[in-house]
């Protein structure tokens, strides 16, 4: 049995999307047990529509719901101990839940997660890791918005954590990792990126294969299993990809409805277009993982639909089932030991 705590008030639509999304996840994974946190007047009527889910779940009342526009400091002051977001995170800390999922305010969720769960040993800053559809299948991209900027040490930690997530999620024994840069040549890029690359080249690692620098177009190609960057660049890349996917879907729709011949052609090609649309749908790959914390927290898109929230829950389910935290902690300990040994020899 895997227990997942849910911030039922998170996102643009709150319980009206969160609970149907959880119900979809429960249908697919009957071994999930949910703990919902939220305002009773809003959560209980929606939960009552799903009797099977309600029977297999627990509801705990909250006093406060964190707004999507609340500043992190404001959210901490107003919501600590009594908001649905805080209580869902705290359930992971106390061991009541194995993972937390929220579609709420990203800044508030990160601030509360850091304050409540603390960081893993030797990790300086957290990263948000996202699952990215590629020509080869899927890749991990991090950081996609936890913090702006990162030094070489932090980028290396991201690489180790991203590889651990790829191993857990994709069941790859030795994931390939690349540092996002403006070119693949070793002389290009910012000093911190070049230094991180040098550290990864010089340190022997069983858990990942460093593939050097990768460029923006390599993300969609699936050149590596995990792409590492800092949060400012990663978030721009994410939003650009999401916007491009929606643009392509709209352009296809317009093209296929322009003439009678195009409409007839669409009838025969509908299956292929539906598969393409599904692969490009952000809801199908929803769920950013907060890496570097001493507990599993999953961030769903605030505007996700029920299918999208279900995807975020499934990411949390897979992270728990594949023992993500234990693997990442072991990888980081091994890396820091190996790097200190290499540094002492230099």
From Swiss-Prot:
Write out the entry's keywords from A to Z.
Answer: Cytoplasm, Lipid biosynthesis, Lipid metabolism, Phospholipid biosynthesis, Phospholipid metabolism, Transferase
**Which residue windows are coiled coil?**
none
Where, subcellularly, is it found?
Answer: Cytoplasm
Which pathway features in its UniProt record? Lipid metabolism; phospholipid metabolism
Gene Ontology cellular-component terms for this entry are: cytoplasm
Q: Recorded GO terms, molecular function?
A: phosphate:acyl-[acyl carrier protein] acyltransferase activity
> Which superkingdom?
Bacteria
Query: Which proteins does it associate with, and in what oligomeric form?
Result: Homodimer. Probably interacts with PlsY.
- Show the NCBIfam families listed in the entry: plsX
- Role summary: Catalyzes the reversible formation of acyl-phosphate (acyl-PO(4)) from acyl-[acyl-carrier-protein] (acyl-ACP). This enzyme utilizes acyl-ACP as fatty acyl donor, but not acyl-CoA.
What is the designated name of this protein?
Phosphate acyltransferase
Tell me the organism: Brucella melitensis biotype 2 (strain ATCC 23457)
Q: Which gene encodes it?
A: plsX
């Amino acid at each position: 049995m895997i227990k997942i705590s849910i911030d039922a008030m998170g996102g643009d639509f709150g319980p009206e999307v969160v609970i149907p999304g959880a119900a979809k996840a429960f249908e697919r994974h009957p071994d999930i047990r949910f703990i919902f946190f939220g305002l009773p007047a809003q959560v209980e009527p929606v939960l009552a529509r799903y009797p099977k889910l309600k029977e297999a779940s627990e509801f705990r009342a909250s006093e406060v719901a964190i707004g999507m526009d609340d500043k992190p400091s404001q959210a901490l002051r107003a919501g600590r101990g009594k908001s649905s977001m805080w209580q869902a995170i705290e359930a992971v800390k106390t061991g009541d839940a194995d993972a937390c999922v929220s579609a709420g305010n990203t800044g508030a969720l990160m601030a509360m997660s850091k304050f409540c769960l603390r960081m893993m040993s030797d990790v300086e800053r957290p990263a948000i890791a996202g699952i990215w559809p590629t020509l080869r299948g899927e890749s991990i991209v991090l950081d996609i918005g936890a913090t702006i900027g990162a030094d070489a040490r932090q980028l290396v930690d991201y690489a180790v954590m991203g590889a651990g997530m790829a191993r857990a999620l994709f069941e790859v024994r030795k994931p390939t990792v690349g540092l996002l840069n403006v070119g693949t040549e070793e002389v290009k890029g910012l000093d911190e990126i070049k230094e991180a690359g040098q550290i990864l080249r010089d340190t022997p690692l069983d858990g990942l294969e460093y593939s050097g620098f990768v460029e923006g177009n390599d993300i969609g190609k699936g050149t590596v299993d995990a792409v590492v960057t800092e949060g400012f660049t990663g978030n721009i890349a994410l939003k650009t990809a999401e916007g491009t996917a929606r643009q392509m879907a709209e352009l296809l729709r317009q093209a296929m409805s322009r003439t009678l011949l195009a409409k007839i052609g669409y009838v025969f090609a509908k299956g292929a277009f539906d598969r393409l649309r599904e692969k490009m749908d952000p809801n199908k790959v929803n769920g950013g993982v907060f890496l570097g914390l001493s507990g599993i927290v999953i961030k769903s898109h605030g505007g996700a639909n029920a299918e999208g929230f279900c995807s975020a829950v499934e990411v949390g389910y897979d992270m728990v089932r594949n023992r993500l935290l234990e693997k990442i902690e072991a990888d980081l300990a091994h890396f820091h030991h190996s790097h200190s040994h290499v540094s002492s020899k230099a």
